[in-house]
């Protein structure tokens, strides 16, 4: 049971004033307390203020002046008989999280009617914005206090998001409503912090929880593995013994997490058709590769924006020509008047019969052929004919609810190839939604045919749609590779937006449309200053681990106050700061260690 002994007292002075947003307290000398601890103060008119420790400092207050205040009696009650106010005091600045009404189960109608200004005893949602008065005793907040102040009881579909651990050893489960993650309130999750501070572990923990909690409605997860073996064991039990502290945190959160199930691993095709991967799972793995017929309509994903927008070499006109006339590229035809067909990458490299209005300079064609050849020579990913490997786009379109796809790109030899895979996945998902795979089944059938045929077709479509997920999550670590920061300055910003790569544009579509689609992005990187500002602008939940103050001083962290930045620079491994509009202030949480195997 929690000990609610006083730990401090509220006060005001010439230099320390209280407002509706913050107030100051004197800390009892022997009490240990830390930033992000929650405290409780009973205020006027049967109300309670819940606050968070934001700043701690030592100050000097003249004891003679202090004793003149009318709350000196409470000071004496707070201190032990052998303690006296010395020249120095520890004081804390408290940010107000919420003002709560103390619920009374006794109706006192007469007192309510006789005192017009008294808050009704049964009012639960009273808009209270009164500064905390001086001379009020302060205690650590209870679990119920914290949960109520953060608005968790009002959440219709709570998703466990971590545990607050206070200095007095009280642990508090923290939830996020599913609407904070998938919309319509907010969407997307981004984690940032220096390497080795478990930012990826937090995102995977949240994904495990979502996979478990949303299985009835249907959720599918696509994980892009960018770091060697990092995500290639997620369906395996961890080998280390699970610590009692981690078990306790799982119990507090009401979770019984197991490794991911329904996992399929997609590994890039390597030499002789074998997987090009740092680890080959025991089962449920497939290789993937790309025929020209798979991606003829998205070749721009292979090229940088500089290449496609270069006025001297109009590569984009060639790409558009291929897309519009595929596979009959030569409209003029051969001797027999039949168009020349392009079947594979080799044919495309050797094809030179583009119309003059498409290829105005021979150097443009040579540059195009050279760039395609660049991907063909060292790579085993772009094949003329697949034998055992699969096309990712086709597999994603067949993805059923509660399946987990791990797409390994870690050992692809170039960033361009990695980006192409990411872009192809994003474009496939964007096409799925634009074609209405999750729409009303009445829109999913061909209207041509008899009434019975249409009814049969609708019934088949409805059965297929029941297998489709309501929610889709895409996880990308090191997203700064694929959606990097643009130039600074107003003109530079406009230029960088127009010069985004085709891959970046597909990612941007996911970010912008996530709310309406229930299709969201979980992303991570070391530094927010390295990523496109659109990620920060469209992300609802920001997860921050340890960072240096120089990084924290950059513009992407403007939503964090200076005191919180100071705490972030001192975080230990496994500690996370959550920033979300649902919380009036950032909160510090921890999570249990992963239940699946880590390489």
Model-predicted segments: where are they?
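Basic- and hydrophobic-enriched, low-structure N-terminal and domain-boundary segments
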Residues: 1-194, 202, 206, 213-218, ...
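Glycine-rich phosphate-binding loop of nucleotide-binding enzymes
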Residues: 161-264, 504, 533
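Pre-Walker A (Motif I) flank of P-loop NTPase domains
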Residues: 184-189, 401-407
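Loop/turn-to-beta-strand initiation segments
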Residues: 218-222, 262, 401-404, 468-473, ...
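Short secondary-structure boundary/capping segments
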Residues: 235-249, 489-494, 538-541, 560, ...
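Helical/strand "switch-coupling" subdomains that flank nucleotide/phosphate-binding cores, especially
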Residues: 254-386
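Conserved P-loop NTPase motor cores
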Residues: 413-563
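Conserved P-loop NTPase motor module
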Residues: 573-599
